[in-house]
């Protein structure tokens, strides 16, 4: 609904998602109210960055004033706090788009991520680009006055929203005269927020959250008036923050708190980073990199098409957000800044696609991040190893993508992988391939693994029986991406990675001659049974053979060496893709009573053969085409085994 006023003001209703968000701000995040100033200052900084970038091609946008700054002020009598900037500003359409709606693409994800924990929810605000609305945590009315650089003074815009009375959920937009470009946001404070009407308080918040902002944040200087016995505001400006590019300073001059504060700005995050690396690269290509590993995964981490992470500067001039070409897709969670001395100031995303300089920077950044992760993973310090464990829980599945995407760094990435295994017998992925190699049995020349849909399915797989008997460790792979990872990682440190559920099982020196002869003898002894079972099962199996991989189970299904495994086939089917046609091999345990009975079974042979196959299929995590027939067969066999009890 839209209402026109005689004075030219237009009243509009908020998008439903914005109403929901405003309710959240007001009622759920009040204990994290300080974030409002951080978010508004961060937005003002972005507006200044955007103006400087657009002015590279259109210097007239500066309108004779290229000294970009952010100003924070307050009025004790009016009970207002004001944040203003002389950045790019907004047109009327931009005001309605940016302040009246939230991008549909992020709305559902934002609300699905909310936990009810105020601290956790607060960090989502900046991450989802809805920081402006945090103003309503402390204000019941917000007034925005803005004009886009390059537009006439008469094309200024006033936006206003009061979250009280009947007007709650509505906002007004009207045309006004505004001589200076940029944006001014005035917060009319709620009752109980009067402590913000203090220069000391506001300066403290700026230094706490926004000290790293590149533009100067100005406030009117305050002096002590002896006669009035209070602080009074002067007409002189003072810069509250350090107002320099943090990444250009020497590492020795930057405190840990400054690094963390800058991350919260550049990463739009409320939490502290897990780790960071800061370096200046000199030589043929000169650039500075300040790269952070977040402590938690972003909401859109699985969207490989979303632009992520790295801000690109050229000679300290902001060029673009989310310069995706600076980091490979499998490191899309990395946040930070790259400042190049070699790229042209008018660089575009199209130029980045073709730039060899960018390829060099990308390679350098990738190695730096992988090196940082490696140093955490292999550190002698328990705290660092704990950080890597946290990293792996949050980002491990994404890092795995690099095995198949980054051939140059494949070995380094493989060394960073972590898996569950039969050694620990817990679902925690804490075992590295190097750990596995260090525990290998004497004479073992392969790394064994099994893939399954869940940890319990993997650890209880019948394929592990012989390995448990011999004390051989097996990696338990249950992540959907693991099948793809293993397909791109045939070996590690000269040792082949081998599935325990594919092909003929060759334990090499781990299998003694007596066992081999016993298996060969059983194959001859059960030859007639194997042929009979193959005939009974028909097209359901490629082959039936005797196995030595089972100790407790009667049978298991095995994929042929070059066929798609059953777990991968299920994953492909779930993704709507057709797996290459293949039939499993049924392996039977000649020592199991059920198999021994089958050798002499005549009347219900087909039922026994079908049940053994179906049980093996279920043990693999498969599904039955005809569960009712399976149950019927089981019932018939149980009744037959019970004889004619109760008829005497």
UniProtKB/Swiss-Prot annotation:
Keyword check for Nucleotide-binding: yes
Source superkingdom: Bacteria
Main location: cytoplasm
Region C, residue ranges: 571-648
GO molecular function terms listed in the Swiss-Prot or TrEMBL record: ATP binding; ATP hydrolysis activity; ATP-dependent protein folding chaperone; unfolded protein binding
Region (B): 350-570
GO cellular component, as recorded: cytoplasm
Oligomer status and interactors: Homodimer.
Family: Belongs to the heat shock protein 90 family.
NCBIfam families: PRK05218.1
Task of the protein: Molecular chaperone. Has ATPase activity.
Record protein name field: Chaperone protein HtpG
Organism listed in the record: Aromatoleum aromaticum (strain DSM 19018 / LMG 30748 / EbN1) (Azoarcus sp. (strain EbN1))
């Amino acid at each position: 609904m839209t209402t026109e006023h005689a004075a030219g003001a237009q009243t509009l209703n908020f998008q439903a998602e914005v109403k929901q968000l405003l309710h959240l701000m007001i009622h759920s995040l009040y204990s994290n109210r300080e974030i409002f100033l951080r978010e508004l200052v961060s937005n003002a900084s972005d507006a200044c960055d955007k103006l400087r970038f657009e002015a590279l091609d259109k210097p007239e946008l500066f309108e004779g004033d290229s000294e970009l700054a952010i100003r924070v002020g307050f009025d004790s009598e009016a009970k207002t706090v004001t944040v203003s900037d002389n950045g790019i500003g907004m047109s009327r359409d931009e005001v309605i788009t940016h302040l009246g709606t939230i991008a549909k693409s992020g709305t559902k994800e934002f609300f699905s991520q909310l936990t009810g924990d105020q601290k956790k929810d607060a960090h989502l605000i900046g991450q989802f680009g809805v920081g402006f609305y945090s103003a309503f945590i402390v204000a019941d009315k917000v007034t925005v006055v803005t004009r886009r650089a390059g537009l006439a003074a008469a094309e200024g815009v006033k936006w206003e929203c009061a979250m009280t009375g009947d007007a709650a959920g509505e906002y007004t937009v009207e045309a006004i005269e505004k001589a200076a470009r940029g944006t001014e946001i005035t917060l009319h404070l709620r009752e109980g927020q009067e402590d913000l009407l203090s220069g000391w308080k506001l300066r403290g918040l700026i230094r706490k959250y926004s000290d790293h902002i590149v533009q100067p944040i100005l406030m009117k200087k305050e002096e002590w008036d002896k006669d009035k016995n209070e602080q009074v505001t002067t007409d002189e400006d003072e810069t509250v923050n350090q107002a320099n590019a943090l990444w250009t300073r020497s590492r020795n001059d930057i405190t840990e708190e400054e690094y963390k504060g800058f991350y919260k700005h550049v990463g739009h995050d409320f939490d502290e980073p897990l780790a960071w690396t800061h370096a200046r690269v000199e030589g043929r290509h000169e650039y500075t990199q300040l790269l952070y590993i977040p402590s938690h995964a972003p909401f859109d981490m699985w969207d490989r098409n979303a632009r992520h992470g790295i801000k690109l500067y050229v000679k300290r001039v902001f060029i673009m957000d989310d310069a995706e070409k600076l980091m490979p897709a499998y490191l899309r969670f990395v946040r930070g800044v790259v400042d190049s001395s070699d790229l042209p100031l008018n660089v575009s995303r199209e130029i980045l696609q073709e730039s060899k300089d960018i390829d060099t920077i990308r390679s350098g950044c990738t190695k730096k991040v992988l090196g940082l992760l490696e140093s955490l993973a292999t550190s002698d310090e328990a705290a660092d190893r704990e950080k890597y464990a946290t990293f792996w829980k949050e980002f491990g599945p994404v890092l795995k993508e690099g095995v198949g995407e980054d051939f140059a760094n494949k070995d380094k990435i493989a060394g960073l992988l972590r898996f569950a295994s039969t050694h620990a017998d817990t679902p925690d992925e804490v075992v590295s391939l190097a750990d596995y190699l260090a525990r290998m049995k004497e004479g073992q020349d392969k790394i064994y693994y099994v893939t399954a849909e869940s940890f319990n399915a993997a650890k209880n797989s019948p394929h592990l029986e012989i390995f448990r008997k011999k004390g051989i460790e097996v990696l338990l792979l249950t992540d959907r991406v693991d099948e793809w990872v293993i397909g791109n990682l045939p070996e590690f440190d000269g040792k082949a990675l081998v599935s325990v559920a594919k092909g003929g099982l060759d334990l090499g020196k781990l299998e003694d001659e007596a066992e081999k002869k016993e298996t060969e003898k059983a194959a001859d002894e059960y030859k007639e049974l194997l042929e009979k079972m193959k005939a009974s099962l028909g097209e359901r199996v490629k082959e039936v053979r005797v196995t030595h991989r089972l100790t407790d189970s009667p049978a298991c299904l095995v994929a042929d060496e070059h066929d798609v495994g059953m777990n991968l086939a299920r994953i492909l089917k779930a993704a709507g893709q057709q797996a290459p046609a293949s039939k499993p091999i049924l392996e039977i345990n000649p020592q199991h009573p059920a198999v021994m009975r089958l050798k002499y079974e005549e009347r219900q042979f087909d039922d026994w053969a079908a049940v053994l196959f179906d049980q093996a299929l279920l043990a693999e995590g498969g599904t039955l085409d005809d569960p009712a027939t399976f149950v019927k067969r089981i019932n018939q066999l149980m009744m037959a085994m019970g004889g004619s009890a109760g008829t005497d």
